[in-house]
């Protein structure tokens, strides 16, 4: 459960992410596909090379969806309800991949932070992304 302090930290940490959604999204997907190559199977029609337009467009969609969750931290499940249904019922994405994506996003955020992330910021962002993973995986029952 995110505390009020966690929510405040996530909102502050998210400002550069949301302002640079295409960049953060594409870099996160590039890291995901490099570290977890089996995730590529969900994108057979994409150009998965780093910096490709496909990664930029889809990466922006990912960050925009997460920004919606940041804007609704008191109802993340509601904010991601349609996305959760899509990934569970239509796309049938392995729910473990949501955790992998979250970890890759943490690395991307850290890489752009200009220095080490403060432990309390990393903890809050990690809790938020863990909550996202749980919400997205919740429709798999």
From Swiss-Prot:
GO BP: hydrogen peroxide catabolic process
The organism's place on the tree of life at top rank: Eukaryota
Globin domain segment(s): 1-141
Pfam families: Globin
Presence of keyword Iron: yes
Tissues expressed in: Red blood cells.
Signal peptide range in chain numbering: none
Positions that bind O2: 58
Keywords: Heme, Iron, Metal-binding, Oxygen transport, Transport
GO CC list: blood microparticle; haptoglobin-hemoglobin complex; hemoglobin complex
GO molecular function: haptoglobin binding; heme binding; iron ion binding; organic acid binding; oxygen binding; oxygen carrier activity; peroxidase activity
InterPro entries on file: Globin, Globin-like_sf, Globin/Proto, Hemoglobin_a-typ, Hemoglobin_oxygen_transport, Hemoglobin_pi
Binding site residues for heme b: 87
Family designation: Belongs to the globin family.
Subunit structure: Heterotetramer of two alpha chains and two beta chains.
Record's function text: Involved in oxygen transport from the lung to the various peripheral tissues.
Protein name: Hemoglobin subunit alpha
Organism per entry: Microcephalophis gracilis (Graceful small-headed sea snake)
Lineage per the UniProt record: Eukaryota, Metazoa, Chordata, Craniata, Vertebrata
Gene: HBA
């Amino acid at each position: 459960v995110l505390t009020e302090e966690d929510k405040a930290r996530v909102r502050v940490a998210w400002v550069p992410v949301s302002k640079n959604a295409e960049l953060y999204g594409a870099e996160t997907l590039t890291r995901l596909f490099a570290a977890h190559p089996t995730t590529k199977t969900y994108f057979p029609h994409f150009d998965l090379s780093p910096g490709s337009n496909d990664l930029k467009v889809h990466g922006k969609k990912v960050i925009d969806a997460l920004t919606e969750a940041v804007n609704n931290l008191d109802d993340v499940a509601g904010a991601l309800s349609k996305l959760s249904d899509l990934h569970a019922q239509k796309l049938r994405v392995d729910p473990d991949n949501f955790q992998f994506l979250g970890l890759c996003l943490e690395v991307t955020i850290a890489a752009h932070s200009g220095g080490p992330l403060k432990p309390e910021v990393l903890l809050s962002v990690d809790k938020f992304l863990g909550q996202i993973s749980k919400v997205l995986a919740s429709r798999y029952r």
